[in-house]
Amino acid sequence: MLNFEYCNPVNVVFGKGQIAKLAELVPQDAKVMMTYGGGSIKRNGVYEQVMDALQGRKVIEFGGIEPNPKYETCMKAVEICKAEGIDFLLAVGGGSTLDGTKFIAAAAKYPEGQDPWDICLKGAPVLDEIPIGCVI
């Protein structure tokens, strides 16, 4: 076995009824963009649980993140983040929603005049990002 150190400063909350913990974990004064995919969260009850937990916060919804998110879709969310002063992203859904939201977080803080696509295409460094939470 190799010697190594691993530091992963991520708070993971797991289990039944844990969505309510968002009330404690998302800053009270946050301007939140909630991202999701095709709308299953509205059919399975997760949407209501998330919105209940986020009461008192400004929440802007961005739905329609498709499987294997398209750059154009994510960039629409980036523009909203910039226009609305979003300072917290909450991805609600599966892997594609989380992947798209991670890109949105980095692209929204990418230097003006530069193309955020370089993060994916050229491996450009991410120097700043909007904080992210996720409900999977």
Residue ranges and their predicted role:
Residues 1-88:
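ATP/NTP phosphate-donor binding region
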Residues 72-136:
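Glycine/threonine-rich beta-strand-loop-alpha-helix active-site module
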